[in-house]
């Protein structure tokens, strides 16, 4: 008996509108699509997920007290260089990074996970430069209800 190895010859592009969607629900859906877990022939060691374009990143919703309670921390590399900012400040400055941070935290941390990072495209507004790829619109609410 031979081992079945699925082919990865289709490059699907999906557009997700983040307006009014909670950050965690959006991130789980996007990470699952990028990884390819929605496919019936999912294989963990093969990159076969979709390219996901997220628009309206500035309109994503954080529930509860997370706008002021959630803190993003980074280290510059210098002494005393620990920089922190709240989710409210991060959404005001660069809303794309908030979604990227949430999605990348749900992807594998090794070589394959770093290769999956290029499959996520996040834009603050409604326009994106990927119209040539003919992306399909994906409704977050209906996609979450199917599971």
From Swiss-Prot:
Task: Give GO MF terms, alphabetically.
Answer: mRNA binding; structural constituent of ribosome
One Gene Ontology BP term is: translation
The record, for Pfam families, names: Ribosomal_L13
Q: What keywords tag this UniProt record?
A: Ribonucleoprotein, Ribosomal protein
Q: Which GO terms describe its cellular component?
A: cytosolic large ribosomal subunit
Q: Which domain of life is it from?
A: Bacteria
Task: Describe its assembly.
Answer: Part of the 50S ribosomal subunit.
Per the entry, what this protein does is: This protein is one of the early assembly proteins of the 50S ribosomal subunit, although it is not seen to bind rRNA by itself. It is important during the early stages of 50S assembly.
Which NCBIfam families does the UniProt entry name for this protein? rplM_bact
Family of this protein: Belongs to the universal ribosomal protein uL13 family.
Name of the protein this chain belongs to: Large ribosomal subunit protein uL13
- Source organism per entry reads Deinococcus geothermalis (strain DSM 11300 / CIP 105573 / AG-3a)
Gene that specifies this protein = rplM
């Amino acid at each position: 008996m031979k081992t079945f190895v699925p082919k990865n010859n289709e490059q699907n592009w999906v557009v997700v509108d983040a307006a009014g969607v909670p950050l965690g629900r959006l991130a789980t859906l996007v990470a699952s699509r990028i990884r390819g877990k929605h496919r019936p022939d999912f294989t963990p060691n093969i990159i076969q997920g979709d390219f996901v374009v997220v628009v309206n990143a500035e309109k994503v919703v954080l529930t509860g007290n997370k706008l002021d309670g959630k803190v993003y921390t980074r280290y510059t590399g210098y002494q005393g260089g620990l920089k922190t900012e709240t989710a409210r400040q991060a959404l005001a400055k660069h809303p794309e990074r908030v979604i990227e941070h949430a999605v990348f935290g749900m992807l594998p941390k090794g070589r394959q996970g770093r290769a999956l990072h290029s499959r996520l495209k996040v834009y603050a507004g409604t326009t994106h430069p990927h119209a040539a790829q003919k992306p399909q619109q994906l409704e977050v609410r209906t996609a979450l209800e199917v599971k």
